[in-house]
Amino acid sequence: MSGLDDGLENPVLIQEYSRQGRATAAPAPLVLFHDGGGTLFSYFFLESLGRDVFGFADPRATSGQQWKDGITEMAIHYYKRMKMEIRPGSVILGGWSFGGLLALQLAQMIASDSAGGFEVVGVVLIDTSCPEKASYSSTVANGPIVPFRDDVPDCMQEIVRTSMVRNTEMLSQWEAPTWPQGYSKPPILLLRAAEGIDAKEERSLKLGWELCQHDVIDSVEMVPGNHYSLFESDNIGTLSSRLRESCKRMETPYRKAASSD
């Protein structure tokens, strides 16, 4: 896969589906997008999901270069890379936190591009809240609070913090995408952390998405942990299992339709 800005290769192959001895077609790949820190680090803790898993990291995280047109420009860039590097066909999109917003944006772009060769059979948001514009100014001014692991180098912590501030600023211009007339929205699942970061924090079941003018979330499943502990050893097994099973459910109607043609 060819290199991008800062020497980063996108997409990154996080998990590879073993095709040895299998006569049936491979499952639809899962394409995951980076979190607010621009990294794919957490996704490498996922247990086997039974399909190819690709990841898109922010190629400008190290340099700090701005995306002038915000999330839309970022998504256009990733979609171009996706068409260059991933085989056309059915795909499942997803992401943790900020990555879920990118997945939604890409899903809308793919639906609008009839000649692109991809069909999104489902979207999985991993504890992705609907952006609250009122919270942007305080996050940018005070800096994000991120509980880093002890083994994360100081230089990487600084890159993540800087990326999170930049991405938070981009959210102030972002609106949840709507699907073009005549196109049906793919099923969208929210895997929601059972706990809040703050015990006093009140979070709605759909994490604010119910306030959108149009329905975004079709179903919600709870997973153990809070926003930052989802990928820790005590919780990663359940998260992986829910993600694996949800991908199977989303893909099943499309595989049945293809086999009957």
From Swiss-Prot:
State its role: Thioesterase; part of the gene clusters that mediate the biosynthesis of AM-toxins, host-selective toxins (HSTs) causing Alternaria blotch on apple, a worldwide distributed disease. AM-toxins are cyclic depsipeptides containing the 3 residues 2-hydroxy-isovaleric acid (2-HIV), dehydroalanine, L-alanine which are common for all 3 AM-toxins I to III. The fourth precursor is L-alpha-amino-methoxyphenyl-valeric acid (L-Amv) for AM-toxin I, L-alpha-amino-phenyl-valeric acid (L-Apv) for AM-toxin II, and L-alpha-amino-hydroxyphenyl-valeric acid (L-Ahv) for AM-toxin III.
Protein's recorded name: Thioesterase AMT4
* Pathway note: Mycotoxin biosynthesis
Q: Give the note.
A: Gene clusters encoding host-selective toxins (HSTs) are localized on conditionally dispensable chromosomes (CDCs), also called supernumerary chromosomes, where they are present in multiple copies. The CDCs are not essential for saprophytic growth but controls host-selective pathogenicity.
Q: Which gene is transcribed and translated to give this protein?
A: AMT4
What lineage, starting at the top, does this entry show? Eukaryota, Fungi, Dikarya, Ascomycota, Pezizomycotina
State the phenotype upon gene disruption: Produces smaller amounts of AM-toxin than the wild type but still causes lesions on apple leaves.
Return one GO MF term.
hydrolase activity
Species of the source: Alternaria alternata (Alternaria rot fungus)
What triggers expression? Expression is up-regulated more than 10 fold in toxin producing cultures.
Give the family, as the similarity comment puts it. Belongs to the AMT4 thioesterase family.
Keywords of this entry: Hydrolase, Virulence
Q: Does the keyword Kinase apply?
A: no
> Can you cite a GO biological process for this protein?
biosynthetic process
Question: Superkingdom of the source?
Answer: Eukaryota
- Under Enzyme Commission nomenclature, its number is 3.1.-.-
Q: Which residues form a coiled coil?
A: none
